[in-house]
């Protein structure tokens, strides 16, 4: 009564297979599956705390900054001399 019977579903499935073909249906199913998998992965990644840092926010004392700066300038001057 008002519902779709198994025979009607089978007829609709046969018509869909005839219209689209099995290869295209298989491809669409694979695309749908990968989209659902990607969505689930994104949702699970959102729940985990972010351990990765986007930038270096650790405080450094002045001596560390001077040492790093002098090492960078030394490397740059060596590179400039090699190119010349």
Swiss-Prot record:
Record GO biological process: protein transport by the Tat complex
InterPro entries in the record: TatA/B/E (IPR003369), TatA/E (IPR006312)
CC per GO annotation: TAT protein transport complex
Membrane-spanning ranges: 1-21
Superkingdom, natural source: Bacteria
Region (Disordered): 40-84
Compartmental location: Cell inner membrane
Molecular function terms, GO-annotated: protein transmembrane transporter activity
Residue spans of biased composition, Basic and acidic residues class: 42-66, 75-84
Keyword Glycosyltransferase attached: no
Keywords for the protein's UniProt record, in alphabetical order: Cell inner membrane, Cell membrane, Membrane, Protein transport, Translocation, Transmembrane, Transmembrane helix, Transport
Topology of this chain in the membrane: Single-pass membrane protein
Chief location of this protein within or outside the cell: membrane
Description of how the protein assembles with itself and partners: The Tat system comprises two distinct complexes: a TatABC complex, containing multiple copies of TatA, TatB and TatC subunits, and a separate TatA complex, containing only TatA subunits. Substrates initially bind to the TatABC complex, which probably triggers association of the separate TatA complex to form the active translocon.
UniProt function note: Part of the twin-arginine translocation (Tat) system that transports large folded proteins containing a characteristic twin-arginine motif in their signal peptide across membranes. TatA could form the protein-conducting channel of the Tat system.
PANTHER family xrefs: SEC-INDEPENDENT PROTEIN TRANSLOCASE PROTEIN TATA
Similarity comment: Belongs to the TatA/E family.
Protein name, entry field: Sec-independent protein translocase protein TatA
Species for this entry: Vibrio atlanticus (strain LGP32)
């Amino acid at each position: 009564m008002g519902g779709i019977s198994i025979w009607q579903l089978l007829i609709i499935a046969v018509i869909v297979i005839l219209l689209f073909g099995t290869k295209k249906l298989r491809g669409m199913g694979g695309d749908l599956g990968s989209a659902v998998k990607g969505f689930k992965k994104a949702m699970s990644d959102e729940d985990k705390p972010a351990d990765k840092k986007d930038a270096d926010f650790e405080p450094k004392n002045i001596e560390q900054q001077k040492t790093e700066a002098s090492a960078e300038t030394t490397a740059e001057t060596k590179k400039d001399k090699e190119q010349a």
